[in-house]
Amino acid sequence: IDLGDGDISTLQISTRNSFDGSWCFHIDVGAVRIICLNGQVFLNDFAMFKARHTAGLNMEHAARKLSKAIDVYQHQADVWSTWRDTPMGDSEAFRIFAKVADCKFITRTKAMAYTDVAKLLLEPEVFRNKTLIRLWEHYVTDERKNLGSTMWAVYNAMTHWATHEQATKSTAQKNIAAIQVARQDRIRKAVKNTLFQAAA
């Protein structure tokens, strides 16, 4: 799907499973943004199937859900197109990044009370949160610069972090696949009940 200006995304269906039972059987419908290879997170549950890997695993149910993958993908492309044209201010973007980064210091009221995010960045609870700082810096230096102050830019900053950022601790890097899955879940949870859901 081409969202314009060569911004192309392709359908991706991923399957995860573990032989030791630590993960359930999981099928995800998503996309890859070709320009940056970000894994794009679908925000609704229609795009995934999850079940414990037991004798009762119902693959027919999984197949029925996956049969709708193209329709879900097409709808998601329409949503992304809307996000490209929907402005988002720095305070709102920063508040969403703070939810993803689990920075409890930032609440809607505090984030909106600051008209300049630069002042928020001086707060110790904020600048110590490496995830929040990485999200914000990537947004400002890359996504906002190239895509404008839009929901699409905010979304792409989050998917960049989920896809490309190293683990915070070097000892956790060997488990980066599980970390990336957890990051995608954090994005889904963080954007619920925000402007992203309203525009979807």
Regions found by a protein language model. Give the residues of each.
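Intrinsically disordered, low-complexity regions enriched in serine/threonine
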Residues: 3-200
